[in-house]
Amino acid sequence: MPPPRGKGRFGKDKRPKRNTQSLLFRRKRFCRFTVTGVTEIDYKDVDTLRDFIAENGKITPARLTGTRAFFQRQLSTCIKRARFLALLPYSDQHKS
């Protein structure tokens, strides 16, 4: 008799288990720029841009920050401009 559908050869579920407790306490994400009434993001505002860059230097995705798509596109463009003008580093690790 074949194993039940959705499970592997030995009856184990292939999908990783999620922590159900963390799902209960998840805070609702909101767009910071919409709440404050910002119409355009400035590439010279480095303090704001740093909040949306991860520790490894990557731009944090909108699904984690809650930023609307309109502002996420502006944000990524501004971060890239600030990096090009040396206002922000490309990565966090610089070998000296």
Curated annotation (Swiss-Prot):
- Where in the sequence does UniProt note compositional bias of the Basic residues kind? 1-18
Keyword Ribonucleoprotein carried by entry: yes
UniProt keyword annotation of Protease present? no
Record-level GO BP terms: translation
Tell me which Gene3D superfamilies the record gives: Ribosomal protein S18
A Gene Ontology molecular function term for this protein is: structural constituent of ribosome
- Protein keywords: Ribonucleoprotein, Ribosomal protein, RNA-binding, rRNA-binding
Q: Would you say which domain of life the source belongs to?
A: Bacteria
Which cellular components does GO assign to this protein?
cytosolic small ribosomal subunit
Where is the segment annotated Disordered? Answer: 1-21
- Function summary: Binds as a heterodimer with protein bS6 to the central domain of the 16S rRNA, where it helps stabilize the platform of the 30S subunit.
Q: Give the record's family classification.
A: Belongs to the bacterial ribosomal protein bS18 family.
**Subunit info?**
Part of the 30S ribosomal subunit. Forms a tight heterodimer with protein bS6.
What is the protein's name according to its record? Answer: Small ribosomal subunit protein bS18
Originating organism: Methylibium petroleiphilum (strain ATCC BAA-1232 / LMG 22953 / PM1)
Question: Which gene underlies this protein?
Answer: rpsR
